[in-house]
Amino acid sequence: IIPITIAAFAAYAFAFMEFRGKEPLFLLVVASMIIPLQMSLIPLVQLFKSGVEVFGLPIIPALDINGAFVATWFAHSGFGLPLATFLLRDFMMSLPRSVIESAKIDGASNMTTFFKLVLPLSVAGIAAFATFQFLWVYNDFLVANVFLGVYKPENLVVTSHVSQLAVGAYGEAWHLRTSGAIISMIVPLTVFFSLQRFFIRGLIGGAVKG
């Protein structure tokens, strides 16, 4: 929810608004998608623990949120925000500009245009990315394990709990593991099939006729 909300506003700004530094800023967003997730884990752990200081001046205060769920929220939001902005911006660019220009001629503000026109027309693209984001976060092991499992073992992700199910008398209780794995698939399958209609529409890129 967090990256989708922020990215929707950012995508509208990149698609329909003119401001200084627009192109370099968008290139920075695209370039941030190239950074491997693994390279940013240690800096994020340090950031969440000690904050950031420049010449002894605290720029970002020490939050000390490692081991809390809010750390994974920030991490997943930060990793998903560039891709969300990129995809939604391309989707909004495919919308008919005549509709947007007509709204501006009629005196509609950017907020009115966004909420009344662009947002309803972008439901398919938002739902498509929401499906991607949910499946990634639900299946994620590395980020959740780094920010939760290392500090509080009781906060282990579903994958770890499934792998640690009861051990039988003569070895691993594979029947429990397979049952747990199948049960853990119910939630993502439910989300995917409920959003399948929007997911397919979002992938083909918003063919909207004005």
Task: Provide a role label for each language-model segment.
Residues 1-210:
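A structural signal for multi-pass alpha-helical bundles of membrane permease subunits
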